[in-house]
Amino acid sequence: MIVIRNWQRISYLSFCRFSTRSLSIQQFQKTPLLLVVRQQGSARLKMTSSPPEIVPQQPLDALLLNKTDTEQEIFLTKYPNYDGRDILIAILDTGVDPSLPGMQVTTTGERKMFDVIDCSGAGDVDTSITRTVKDGVIEGISGRKLAIPEKWKCPTGQYHVGLKPIFELYTKGVKSRVISERKEDVVGPSHNIAASEALKQLTEHEKVVGGTSEKTSDKWAREDFACKVDFLKSMASVADVGPVADVVTWHDGEMWRVCIDTSFRGRLGLGNVLGTFRETGDYAYLTNKDSVVYTVRVSPDGNLTEIVVPSGAHGSHVAGIAAANYPDNPQKNGLAPGAKILSLNIGDHRLGAMETGQAMTRAFNMCAELNVDIINMSFGEGTHLPDVGRVIEEARRLINRRGVIYVCSAGNQGPALSTVGAPGGTTTGVIGIGAYLTSESADTLYGVYKPVESSIYPWSSRGPCQDGKLGVSLVAPAAAFAGVPQYCRQSMQMMNGTSMSSPNAAGNVACMLSGLKQNNLKWTPYTVRMALENTAYMLPHIESFSQGQGMIKIATAYEKLSEILVNKVFPPRLTHFEINVSNHCKKSKGVYVREPNWNGPQEFTIGVEPIFQNHLSDNNLPAISFEKQIILQSTAPWVSHPQTMFVVAQERTMVVTVDASKAPKGANYTEIVGIDTADPSLGPIFRIPVTVINPEKVAVDQYTSRLVGKSGVTERRFVEVPSWATSAKITLRSTNKDEMDRFTLHTVYIEDDKCSRNTETQKIQGPIGNEWSKSITVQGGKTLEACVVRAWSRGKNPVDVDMTIDFFGVKKPTSISLIHGATNTPIRFQAAPTKSIDVSPSISLKSLVVSLKPQSAKVEPLGPRDMFLTSGLQINRLLLTYQLKVQKPSEVQLQLAGLTPYLYESPVDCVLFQIFGANKSFVGASSSYPDRWTQKLEKGDYTIQAQIRYPDDQVLQGMKELPLLVHVKLGNKISVDLAASASDATLGKECKFAGKALLPNQEMTVYAMNIADDKLPKTIVPTSGSFLAGTFSALKDSDLSDVDKSEVIYFLSEYSTRPTKGLSMVTTKKDTNQNQEMTDAIRDLEVSWVQKLTDEKAAKEFFEACLQKYPDHLPLLQNRVKQLMQAKLVDQTPENVQKIIELCGQILQITKPNETLQFSSVKQEHDDDLLTVDKWLALTGGSEDQRKDVVKLISQFEERKKSIILALQALSSLEQDIEVRKSKFDVPASLRFGGITPLIFGGKQGEVINKKSEGYEALKSKSEQIDATVSEELKKLDSNWTGNQFYVKLLVWLSADDTKTALISAKHAAALGQFGRCAKLLNKAGDELKSSATDSQAVDTSLAEVCESLEWNHLATHFKNSALIKNRTSYRLF
């Protein structure tokens, strides 16, 4: 039984939408319905045996994708074979999943997917290292032994190996889901069991031993149990780094093959062997759990393997709209089911699937190489500079030289005007598609039951482009259900946007081209576009800015285009008519009069030039013979122009006058169209767009207007902003709105060469309340557009909305510069002439900007995929490397001034950053629009690489000194104190300006004070050129002050070293002797070189020579001990360890540990030298005459203490190496054989081995020799030595978990089999090493082995993967 309340209208289709299961029509008709009929406030029940008989007019599948409004159904009914066959569509998007049902075959049975390519580089794997098989295995980059199946063929015997973290191939959503499922299904249960067992062991020990004991072993055991509990608790929230796969690439004699070790254990026979997709069509899934499909490509030399995965669901959905083919259910087909698809992924995984210049230009090159017919690109961004930039240059070359039809989304930034994006709405030759809402789809696609009128979606971007082009070319249906990648875990998904209208249009065009190709008719982008625009249906009551030339009508367009091509109306190499508009110094592509100061007659010089494709031919006859007699027409009385034009193959100019004062208020659009007198039925052969915005004036400081809120209909108001205004508050009031009504408020004003996203404000108002307000920034003298649109789904009954715009103004500097150290800096501001304002001036600094110089810069040519076919250009790159030291966890953004604000309009191909940790671990990426890419950096050292791509290597050479600006978000904003006068500011007298007001036109000056040094940020040490950035606001109103701001730059000098106490502190007077200072400097230089020499023989000889001159100099002895202790076990010798122990003994003899320990108890952290001298004299019973000697002695104690600790570190480390090697417990091999010992002394890690490693037995034998020597020498040093004495002595000076002691303590714990304590200490040491430039792989490997010993296998796996991810053999490729 089904209960339905408020029965008004129900159909089989809408019923199925609400039902939890799918019903056939017959089942639906037989289902009893319980209707609840509302009558006079009460409900009465009525049982019905069956619903009214409703027969759906079409199956539900037919409503998933609109093919009716564009005439596609009519077209294919008439021409069933013109379904896209023989046409190749390139989908420049997030990649297409080749496993989808609709992507398998065309209507002719051919493979649907021509190729699948990742142009971004995010899936690249360096496979330049080769291995040969030995005993049936090769060693992977991971260190795993990879078993080569016997059935693999490799005539060369060379296997290329690489490494890829699997999470780098996941989208953010997939990664989040996989982590959650792994935690719930695998990691979580295992971890909970381990934590429970650890707590049980601790509780049991507490019961048995109690709180006191005389045995040290009980102390260590208790600590071990407690450490297990603490360690497991800390690991419960650790980030899942995911598995790491070895990649093996080889040539089987016919083609390159690739196997990704998805067993993660070296069992390659369990993995999938794939050939390159273009040749084989092979694809596989990374794992069954994630369902992420991948394909592969390999460079000609095998040194680069591309793992191609979708970076989002968007691309598959778009491809499904354009050309999906379902042989068993044709109603689900895309628009061109017979077409083939070329998947070109331009959405970079590293950037959340945002496009990059690198990806787009590579994609254009592939389109040229593979002879693509149509591009669909459902991507785009706002642009500061329309129709320019390296990406745009390559796009236009592809259109003009290769004849590719380029269809692109216009953007989703509406409803305000001039919001079209690049490239769809701003690029000459690109067909920009707007978004059409069909009333028939509202029920099925959106679940909207109220009547809906077909219209343009409110969010669809509108023209005109800022350079005067109309922006939107055509519109097409913009919502559909289509297939999405299997990792989405659903077969289809509903999406809307111009991203969906563009492939709808592209699919329609593919059908048209399919017919032309089968009839051997040669088209050009120009003829295709002209036929589409001249036959499109202009939707009634919808402005041209929204719909361009109207709805695509493909059947009509095909007939028109066929006629043009058959009659050869245009030369085949005519690419387009170039329109150039000049007005004084401004160049544009159309006439766009918007600002109030243009309100009068304006003259424009307009050039019209036919452009021919001449780059591939010496035949100039088509251009020479080209002649057209043109009639010029327009319908607007405010435009005056010549009536005729004779066009030949050169630019022809004319003068056009536009009188904005004669145009109606609001937005006005017309076109000067060129009609061929020889054949007027063709329609316009070129169009000159003319837009005039005639704004309304404001009465004093307020504008009001009543809007009619029809669902989905945009109400626009254009207002001349008063010259003094800097901000405004817009208020909307509705008295008769529906309780669920929502309104979108969108405001825009235009600045020259600035994208509308920088000057727009958009907010959805409602549904709560009936009055809303929004404060915005405005610019005096500009035209402000304020448009309001009611949600399109609210039905046909309009509501009234009153809009009020109140203007406010405060005249102030647009930018304020302050200098650290300046005691007062005046800042002047003035109230508007029309009203008083309440003021509360303030300066808030929000970020530190640090300027970094490049440490290295290299210009080099890129590989084969960056040799561009259409332009013939070899793309080069400049690789800049910067070093960044972060002292506290920070959030940073990266900027190259003058380059990163741009993408499509960028003068270079691409700017891409990658951030790496100390050991080449990948941390994050950034590119254009730095404010979108915030990286969270922990304390440590980082390497930042910036890649700039450009064809001309000399241009890149000139950029080799570019500074990198690192924007560091301040944890707490810094407020700059303001004073009422210069003298108050200098004297530090801050003024609170609460309750202050300015009369109209009144001026006020405040004085910015200096920031105290202790308030400056310490996250990153500023360099020369660094500054603090923030804003200044004068207004008291919080909403207005948030938008009415001036930029503030506070320039810093480099930090000076500050004393720990006040400047008035009295310190001990030190004797100076210039000759002694010189002698000491020479000695220190020599001593520093002892540790720098890498040749052991030279180092030994130099040390002995220095020792003769400075026999008791502690830094000399320390440096030699460090140098010898940094040696790996494989390089260590009995003679060297003997020397280490000898030197440590010498150090302990010189330093007198007991005396030094006494001093440590006397010297407190904040004591000054004078007080310490008094304490020492009192403790030792010394006299005042000994003061000078004590002062000298005290100055030596810190160096003595440092030397003692180093000596005990070395002795205890050698001592514990013996203990772990003779331990009866299963101590990890990396601990047992000195893998971490060199790390203690600042060296590189030792061997990371296990019992199966080659050389294990030889290393074991050598360790026995070393241990024998160490044991003998330690007994000589301390006759009472039995095994742990030096470690216990070290604990006198440092705690067991001190960073200098942690690794030694870990060895001590491992020797006792106390792996809980060992794990906690290793984890702490690993965190410390990770933040420095020290390789921590040995520590992570040891941690993994310790966890295996404890049977914490989930953590063992984590640390193995972590070791590989944190310690890369090379930087991630760009």
From Swiss-Prot:
Enzyme Commission number: 3.4.14.10
GO cellular component: cytosol
Record bears the keyword Hydrolase: yes
Sequence similarity: Belongs to the peptidase S8 family.
Protein name, UniProt field: Tripeptidyl-peptidase 2
Pfam families: Peptidase_S8 (PF00082), TPPII (PF12580), TPPII_C (PF12583), TPPII_GBD (PF21316), TPPII_Ig-like-1 (PF21223)
GO molecular function: aminopeptidase activity; serine-type endopeptidase activity; tripeptidyl-peptidase activity
Organism: Caenorhabditis elegans
Catalytic activity: Release of an N-terminal tripeptide from a polypeptide
InterPro entries found in the cross-reference section: Peptidase_S8/S53_dom, Peptidase_S8/S53_dom_sf, Peptidase_S8_His-AS, Peptidase_S8_Ser-AS, Peptidase_S8_subtilisin-like, Peptidase_S8_subtilisin-rel, TPP_II_domain, TPPII_C_art
Group of enzyme by EC: hydrolase
Cited CDD domains: Peptidases_S8_Tripeptidyl_Aminopeptidase_II (cd04857)
Null allele phenotype: RNAi-mediated knockdown causes reduced fat storage but does not affect feeding behavior.
GO biological process: positive regulation of lipid storage; proteolysis
